[in-house]
Amino acid sequence: MGMTRSKHLVLGFDQVIGKDKRFKFETYYQTLSNIPVTTRPSSFSLANTGSGFSRFFPDTLVNSGTGTNYGVEFTFEKSFTKGYFYMATLSLFDAKYKGSDGVERNSDFNTDYAFNALFAKEWKVSKRGILNLGGKITMAGARRYSPIDTFASRRQREYVELDAQKNTLRFGNAYSRIDARISYKINAKKVTHEIAFDLVNITNNRNILKYSYTSDAPYFREEYQLGFLPVFYYKLDF
């Protein structure tokens, strides 16, 4: 197999606001070529790998696939001054590809938009102790998926997509997740102690990851991404 090739065209704008804030804008256009696809006509493209955890066993591959990505990104950030910082980013984009069947489709990564916002605040509560509180919000458009091939799925006992209708449907809900973190750090002479408590997906939002096969009609069920997860840890830095 040969190497996948890409060409990029990028235009950006960066503006410093005051002493500690910055606004950035970037628009881009990218073309992809030589993407591995199957020799027989199908919707498969290696450009989609990495979007999930499904196994795939492709036929013989050839470097003839293509793809196109374009969009805009906005970033507003405040650097760490006066004991706190924050940053927000918004991406609006479109991602298409062509398999060996020559049909242009939405890629697995084409959620149309993504939004992230994070902040952290720090308080010095003693000579050596620092309390930190932070949070993060992540949002993205609904993931795309393909209708089930019921006959093939029942025969193979796993979710088999209708190849001709690859990524023509979308899950009902957009992706959203809120994380929070609180930590306490003690700066000793030779070592730094840190005790932290992370709250992952504190609203326990049920974000759909994929559909999987089930033996009962309608022969598929929803599989969800990580729900609420509290994580405690203690760290030593020497």
What are these regions (language model features)?
Residues 1, 60-65, 104-106, 167-171, ...:
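Outer-membrane beta-barrel domain signature
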Residues 2-57, 198:
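Membrane-embedded beta-barrel scaffold of Gram-negative outer-membrane proteins
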Residues 5-9, 66-70, 107-115, 174-178, ...:
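Residues that define the transmembrane beta-barrel architecture of outer-membrane proteins
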Residues 6-7, 53-61, 98-102, 160-168, ...:
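Extracytoplasmic loops and strand-loop junctions of Gram-negative outer membrane beta-barrel proteins
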Residues 9-17, 21-29, 72-78, 84-92, ...:
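Membrane-embedded beta-strands that build the outer-membrane beta-barrel scaffold
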Residues 29-31, 51-142:
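Gram-negative outer-membrane beta-barrel transporters
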Residues 33, 38, 86, 138-159, ...:
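C-terminal beta-signal and adjacent terminal beta-strands/loops
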Residues 110-185:
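C-terminal beta-barrel architecture of Gram-negative outer-membrane proteins
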